[in-house]
Amino acid sequence: MKIITLEEHQFNKYAENHKYRSYYQSSAYGKIMKKFGYDIHYLGVIDDNENIIGASLLLYKEVFMNYKIAYAPRGLLFDYSNGALLKEFTERLKRLLSKQGFMLLKIDPVIPVSLHNATGKILNINPESNIIVENLKASHWEYHGPTLFFETEKPRFEAVISLDKDINTIYNSFEKRVRYKIKKAIRSGVEIIKGGEQNIPLFYEFVKKKYARPIEYYQEFYKQFEGNVDLYFAKLNTETFVINSKKLYEKEMEINDNLAYKIQQAKNANTRKKLINEKIESDKLINTYKKNLVWATNLLKENPNGILISSSFVLRYDHAAFLIIE
C-alpha cells in the first residue's frame, strides 16, 4: 500500500464512482473552498498493483508555527469494512501527515446507518454500520458518537424524498396539513419560477441574514457546479391574490346572507340558536376576508408585477437534488 497525490482527473474518476460519493468529495467543491481560504490536496491510496483503493479531498489550513489542521469533507473514500486494510492505511496516513506538520485530521464519511420514515420508524438498517464504527475505533480514530444537534461539521441526519414516482403519488404521500398549505398557497397566487446566475443577488437577499457566507460563495458554487445548480423563487402573483381574496369575501357574504335569511325563517329555538352561532363564525370570517382583500389590493397597487417571497439554491448531483440552502 502507498499513499500518493492524485491528479484532479484521477481523483474525480475514483470519487464519482465510490459507494460513499458526495458532492463534498469533488474537485468542484475543493475549488470553491480554495477560493475561501483553504488549501486543497487530492490524496490517493494504491495497492501493490497500483490500483487506487482509496482517495479523498483534503481541505487544510495553517494554524500556527507551520502546523496545520485538515478536514476531509464527507471523506475519506475508503473501504471501512476491511478492518486490517483500514488499520494499515490509518497508520501510514498518520505518519505521513505528522511528517508534513499536520496536527489534526477530521473525517465524516457518508456511511448510512438506518432509514426512517416521517414518524421515526426504522425502515432499513445498514448491517455494516456497526462493523465500520468498531473498525474505525480499532484504528484509533476518535469517534464523536451519535450526535443529535450541531456538534459536527456536517449534519448526522438528512431528510430524503424519493422522486421515482409520478408527481401525484408524491403529492398524495404528503401529510394532509402539508397538502392543504400547498393548495392554499396556489389559490393565493403563489407561483414557482426558475432563476439563473444573474439572479444570485436576489437570492442572496433572502439568506444573507440567516447564514454567514458572502455572496461570492454562492457565485463560485454556481460557477464550479456549472449546469447543475438551479435557483428557484416563490413569487406571489398579486393580481391572482386580489382575485381569489375577492372570491373568498364574496362567497362568504353569500353564505352570511343565506344564514341571516334562515334565522328569520326559523321557528324552532334550537335551530335558530345553531344558525345564529354559524352566522357569528361567518361574521368573523367576513371580517378576516375583508382585511385580506384590502391588504391584497394594496399589494397589487404597490407591486403590480408580483413579489418574490422566498428562494432556494438546489444542486443536482448523482441522480439526486440537494437543497443547499433556502
Predicted region positions:
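A conserved beta-strand-loop-helix scaffold within acyl/acetyltransferase catalytic domains
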Residues: I3-N49, I53-M65, W141-T152, V160-D166, ...
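Acyl-donor binding region in acyl/amide transferases
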Residues: Y67-E151, L202, K291, P304-I309, ...
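Active-site neighborhood for divalent-cation/phosphate handling
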Residues: P155
